[in-house]
């Protein structure tokens, strides 16, 4: 299935929306309009990007956007090749890769989320056009916008270890390294079940432990050990990891937003002093047991929050 993306001006978007009928209600966050035309999905995003998705994507894009052509996409690709991010990812992005990454491991509040994603050579130009990058460089709003698009065409597996289960496993002696090894391995196996593994060149894991440590903790064998690589700062070296990073971060951010709504407080990320203060407020209003259902109990923030309350 082909995917073609254009960056349009407001005027061009208005013209496009006048040519066919678009839905503008009940859309994912970041999406402005959506249409189905000649077996092709046309998505217009608030960012000004338009994605044509389907077997006839190129023909439909030429029909609806005659002033544009696939050359625009090629020019964008060539322009992007000049930037440092593409230079860093050039090796892996010449191959079909599964990348895996996690989010939430350094945050007191919220779950641990892990994603594995399969990115082919054909995906690279569209991912570059969409603006896929290391999730640590992206705002939460941009992550949500990108993830809503990525999950529609990238084969992936997203796993979430919620706080209550996380705390149970941690109490049994599971370290974060073991949790991540198990989740990464399961997510990768899930993706392998969705694709033709003969098309896979590499599995690239954002390294959080050395290979032998990962093997020890994963509970099951690495599916394709000879094709598996471990990369530090993997988001900047592999687009597959960058995609996995965005989707896992999206799941974490979405969950954090839901927690904030549920308790009517803005829950900060990380594990700093602001987190201690909010944790103390939650204990005072809802009790320590409730705090434990939305946080990682073994973090020092729990003890610090209780100390904040003692003088009160």
From Swiss-Prot:
<feature type="domain" description="RNase H type-2">
    <location>
        <begin position="95"/>
        <end position="311"/>
    </location>
</feature>
<keyword id="KW-0460">Magnesium</keyword>
<dbReference type="Pfam" id="PF01351">
    <property type="entry name" value="RNase_HII"/>
</dbReference>
<dbReference type="Pfam" id="PF11858">
    <property type="entry name" value="DUF3378"/>
</dbReference>
<comment type="similarity">
    <text>Belongs to the RNase HII family. RnhC subfamily.</text>
</comment>
<feature type="binding site">
    <location>
        <position position="102"/>
    </location>
    <ligand>
        <name>a divalent metal cation</name>
    </ligand>
</feature>
<keyword id="KW-0540">Nuclease</keyword>
<dbReference type="GO" id="GO:0032299">
    <property type="term" value="C:ribonuclease H2 complex"/>
</dbReference>
<dbReference type="InterPro" id="IPR036397">
    <property type="entry name" value="RNaseH_sf"/>
</dbReference>
<feature type="binding site">
    <location>
        <position position="206"/>
    </location>
    <ligand>
        <name>a divalent metal cation</name>
    </ligand>
</feature>
<dbReference type="GO" id="GO:0003723">
    <property type="term" value="F:RNA binding"/>
</dbReference>
<dbReference type="InterPro" id="IPR024568">
    <property type="entry name" value="RNase_HIII_N"/>
</dbReference>
<dbReference type="GO" id="GO:0005737">
    <property type="term" value="C:cytoplasm"/>
</dbReference>
<dbReference type="GO" id="GO:0006298">
    <property type="term" value="P:mismatch repair"/>
</dbReference>
<dbReference type="InterPro" id="IPR004641">
    <property type="entry name" value="RNase_HIII"/>
</dbReference>
<keyword id="KW-0255">Endonuclease</keyword>
<protein>
    <recommendedName>
        <fullName>Ribonuclease HIII</fullName>
        <ecNumber>3.1.26.4</ecNumber>
    </recommendedName>
</protein>
<feature type="binding site">
    <location>
        <position position="101"/>
    </location>
    <ligand>
        <name>a divalent metal cation</name>
    </ligand>
</feature>
<dbReference type="InterPro" id="IPR012295">
    <property type="entry name" value="TBP_dom_sf"/>
</dbReference>
<keyword id="KW-0963">Cytoplasm</keyword>
<dbReference type="InterPro" id="IPR012337">
    <property type="entry name" value="RNaseH-like_sf"/>
</dbReference>
<keyword id="KW-0378">Hydrolase</keyword>
<comment type="function">
    <text>Endonuclease that specifically degrades the RNA of RNA-DNA hybrids.</text>
</comment>
<dbReference type="GO" id="GO:0043137">
    <property type="term" value="P:DNA replication, removal of RNA primer"/>
</dbReference>
<dbReference type="InterPro" id="IPR001352">
    <property type="entry name" value="RNase_HII/HIII"/>
</dbReference>
<dbReference type="InterPro" id="IPR024567">
    <property type="entry name" value="RNase_HII/HIII_dom"/>
</dbReference>
<keyword id="KW-0479">Metal-binding</keyword>
<dbReference type="GO" id="GO:0004523">
    <property type="term" value="F:RNA-DNA hybrid ribonuclease activity"/>
</dbReference>
<dbReference type="GO" id="GO:0000287">
    <property type="term" value="F:magnesium ion binding"/>
</dbReference>
């Amino acid at each position: 299935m082909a995917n073609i993306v254009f960056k349009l001006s407001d005027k061009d978007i208005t013209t496009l929306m006048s040519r066919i009928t678009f839905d503008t209600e009940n859309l994912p966050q970041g999406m402005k309009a959506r249409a189905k035309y000649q077996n092709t999905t046309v998505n217009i995003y608030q960012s000004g990007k338009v994605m044509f998705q389907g077997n006839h994507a190129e023909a439909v894009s030429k029909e609806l956007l005659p002033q544009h052509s696939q050359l625009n996409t090629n020019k964008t690709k060539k322009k992007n090749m000049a930037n440092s991010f593409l230079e860093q990812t050039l090796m892996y992005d010449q191959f079909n890769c599964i990348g895996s990454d996690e989010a939430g491991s350094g945050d007191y509040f919220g779950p641990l989320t892990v994603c594995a994603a399969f990115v082919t050579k054909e995906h690279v130009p569209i991912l570059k056009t969409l603006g896929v990058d290391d999730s640590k460089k992206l705002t939460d709003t941009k992550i949500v916008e990108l993830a809503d698009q990525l999950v529609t065409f990238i084969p992936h597996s997203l796993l979430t270890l919620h706080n209550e289960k996380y705390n149970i496993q941690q109490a049994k002696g599971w370290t974060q390294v073991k949790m991540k090894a198990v989740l990464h391995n399961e997510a990768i196996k899930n993706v392998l079940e969705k694709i033709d593994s003969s098309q896979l060149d590499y599995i690239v894991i954002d390294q959080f432990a050395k290979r032998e440590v990962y093997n020890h903790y994963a509970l099951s064998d690495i599916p394709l050990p000879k094709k598996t690589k471990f990369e530090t700062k993997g988001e900047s070296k592999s687009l597959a990891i960058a995609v996995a990073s965005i989707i896992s971060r999206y799941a974490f951010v979405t969950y954090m937003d839901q927690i904030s709504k549920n308790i009517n407080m803005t829950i900060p990320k990380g594990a700093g002093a602001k987190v201690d203060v909010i944790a103390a407020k939650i204990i005072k209003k809802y009790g320590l047991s409730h705090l434990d259902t939305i946080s990682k109990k073994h973090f020092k923030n729990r003890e610090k929050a209780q100390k904040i309350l003692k003088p009160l």
